[in-house]
């Protein structure tokens, strides 16, 4: 890891964070344990969307789905992701990534993450499209 990338395992869940040197979407850190603070849920979703510029991991797509299922408004997360990327990420490109489930294939180790939802990339795509319509 580098100074701008850290990983933790908390209660069996691997948390990995990358910090852009110029931008941070975190508006309010949440105290977790001792001197450990974590990003708020909207910021996590924004970081997940931003990292999709560099990788197409199913777990990122799934995480975005889970966050949206928890009631976080997609429009707010999209705006935050665009800001976080320094506007290198464009709305049109982000929407194209989010609404193309074919980009995301479930890796062999995904089940080790003990997902709450049994959902396919196609089902996530449909859900995201529905969220965008509302």
Question: Where do the language-model regions lie?
Answer:
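Compositionally biased terminal segments of proteins
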Residues: 1-134
